[in-house]
């Protein structure tokens, strides 16, 4: 879906707030105001386009909004040791402006959504099918905004009625509680589920848009953030059963990380961020909602942060040695490497000769004696996922907002693994949970798990899901940071120790050592070794609310990261103990 550029001023930007009259006035269409805009379906459809465009900005998903969570997880480390470093080290100060960009851009999204939702009214029964789709999409996108704001900043301001801030004073809201924020997220997704069509019923219209399947998937995710496993399981079962349309795993895992109509918005995707294919883009990088351009590239820069320096990338982020070794530790039933490794980490492996595009890095052949690293000063395993490192599209990184690969934010494999997790939480290890996991493993050619190996041990099956199945399936994607928070891994001594081990990496300019295993036990003995989680400060599993934002709003206070306060007393359930799977 191509998202056309609409002027932010026309689409009710933050600086043009005013009260609205619901009556239609005859006015000059070229001189729209907040009093005349939004009184018909056509103008509200333009607002929908604007909202979708906002989720493609720097602070939402085009770069920082995506990669901050990737940094927070234990599958990725900051190989530049400059850009993102305080966020990777989980000790970002509240004066770091980068941390404000997601806050800024998600509230732009919320503003446009609020305007449209308010225009639609509260009584859904009187809405036409077109208006239901408009309101449903905006509820989904507002829910998505608050999902991200709550997961990042813990206590965001909740603004859900456009009329309540039609004056400037109404903008200075107070913090919500964590529970209040998740309540709002759940409410928005739940209502969106009732208004939107399925991907099947929506047909061509549904391509690239939010559907009831997307809303259901995110509703389950939101429920799981507070350990509402029984409720989430019911929703996930409905998705699997086809209530919200047909979804299935793509036969080729790599099809989830390529651009083009043959791969994007496929049968596995519940929701993805739409970007224009390379070669069809404009020339202007549109980083923020205030520098819009009719000739915007409409691409993302996640690839720029992941890309190796030798290939023109910014060389900022690398895959963790733990993730690489996890892939190498289990072969397929035919004795080969897990094919997901090829699409996740850009290493040379003899087995990749003849597989897909072979041993290439941006069409440049790789050899065993000339490995590619992310950063020439600090090394690092290059991240292949959501880049063109393995797609054969071009021979070097095109930096800036030029990557055209749609970011698949929720896939059917996530539904299956979450259903297995919830089933395990509710009923303990069952054959049903194992079967759902095995669907994902079978796509990769791995052997089936056996219930007998987990019988009566929910902690062991959780370990398998959390630290084997999910990292292999979703390694280096957005979401791992959210998982670590909801699982309580920062609040348990053995789990914190575990993520310190997972987060250990080597800083070296010796490219021959890039694939070596590392040991947390040697941190402090070997100056090249470091673990990001050693520098974690209590409360900084969330990101601090920017001090400039606090200065502008006297009603707003900092969160646990601003105050360096522990959240251990705010858990929604016990933390699973570490279980040795070997």
What are these regions, as identified by a protein language model?
Residues 20-21, 52, 76, 106-107, ...:
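Long, intrinsically disordered, low-complexity segments
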Residues 40-59, 81-153, 172-180, 189-202, ...:
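Conserved, well-structured interaction surfaces
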Residues 21-80, 190-193, 209-368, 496, ...:
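An aromatic- and glycine-enriched ligand-binding surface/loop that stacks and positions planar moieties
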Residues 182, 229, 429-430:
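TPR-repeat structural position
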Residues 327-411, 578-582:
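Flexible, polar/acidic helix-loop-strand segments at domain edges
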């Amino acid at each position: 879906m191509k998202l056309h550029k609409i002027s932010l001023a026309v689409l009710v930007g933050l600086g043009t707030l005013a009260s609205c009259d619901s009556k239609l006035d005859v006015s000059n269409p070229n001189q729209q105001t907040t009093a005349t805009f939004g009184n018909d379906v056509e103008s509200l459809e333009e607002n929908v386009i604007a909202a979708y465009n906002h989720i493609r900005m720097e602070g939402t998903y085009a770069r920082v909004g995506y990669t901050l969570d990737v940094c927070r997880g234990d599958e990725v480390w900051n190989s530049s040791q400059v850009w993102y470093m305080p966020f990777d080290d989980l000790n970002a100060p509240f004066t770091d402006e980068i941390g404000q960009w997601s806050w800024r851009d998600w509230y732009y999204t919320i503003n446009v959504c609020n305007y449209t939702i308010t225009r639609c009214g509260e009584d859904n029964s009187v809405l036409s099918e077109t208006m239901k789709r408009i309101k449903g999409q905006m509820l989904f996108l507002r829910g998505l905004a608050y999902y991200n704001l709550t997961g990042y900043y813990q206590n965001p301001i909740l603004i859900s009625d456009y009329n309540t801030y039609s004056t400037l004073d109404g903008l200075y809201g107070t913090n919500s509680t964590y529970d209040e924020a998740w309540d709002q997220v759940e409410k928005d997704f739940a209502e969106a589920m009732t208004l939107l069509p399925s991907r099947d019923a929506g047909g061509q219209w549904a391509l690239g848009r939010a559907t009831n399947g997307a809303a259901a998937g995110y509703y389950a995710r939101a429920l799981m953030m507070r350990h509402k496993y029984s409720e989430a399981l019911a929703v996930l079962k409905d998705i699997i059963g086809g209530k919200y349309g047909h979804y299935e795993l793509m036969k080729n895992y790599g099809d989830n990380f390529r651009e083009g109509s043959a791969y994007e918005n496929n049968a596995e995707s519940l929701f993805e961020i739409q970007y224009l294919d390379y070669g069809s883009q404009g020339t202007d990088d549109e980083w923020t909602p205030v520098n819009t351009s009719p000739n915007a590239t409409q691409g993302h820069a996640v690839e720029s942060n992941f890309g190796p320096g030798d290939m023109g990338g910014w060389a900022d982020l690398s895959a963790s040695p733990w993730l690489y070794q996890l892939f190498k530790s289990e072969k397929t039933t035919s004795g080969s490497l897990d094919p997901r490794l090829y699409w996740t980490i850009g290493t040379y492996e003899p087995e990749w000769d003849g597989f897909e595009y072979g041993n290439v890095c941006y069409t440049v052949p790789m050899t065993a004696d000339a490995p590619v690293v992310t950063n020439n000063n600090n090394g690092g395993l290059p991240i292949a996922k959501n880049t063109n490192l393995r797609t054969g599209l071009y021979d070097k990184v095109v930096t800036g907002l030029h990557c055209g690969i749609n970011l698949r934010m929720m896939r059917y494999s996530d539904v299956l693994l979450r259903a297995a997790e919830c089933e395990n939480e509710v009923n303990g290890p069952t054959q049903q949970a194992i079967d759902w996991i095995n669907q994902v493993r079978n796509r990769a050619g791995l052997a089936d798990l056996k219930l007998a190996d987990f019988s009566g041990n929910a902690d062991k099956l959780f370990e398998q899901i959390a630290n084997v199945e999910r990292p292999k399936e979703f390694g280096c994607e957005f979401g791992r940071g959210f998982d670590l928070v909801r699982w309580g891994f920062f609040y348990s001594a053995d789990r914190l120790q575990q993520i310190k081990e997972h987060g250990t990496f080597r800083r070296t300019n010796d490219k021959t050592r890039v694939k070596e295993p590392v040991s947390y036990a040697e941190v402090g003995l070997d100056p090249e070794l470091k673990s990001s989680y050693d520098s974690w400060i209590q409360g900084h599993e969330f990101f601090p609310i920017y001090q400039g934002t606090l200065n502008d709003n006297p009603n707003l206070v900092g969160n646990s990261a601003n105050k360096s306060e522990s959240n251990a007393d705010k858990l929604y359930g016990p933390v699973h103990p570490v279980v040795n799977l070997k």
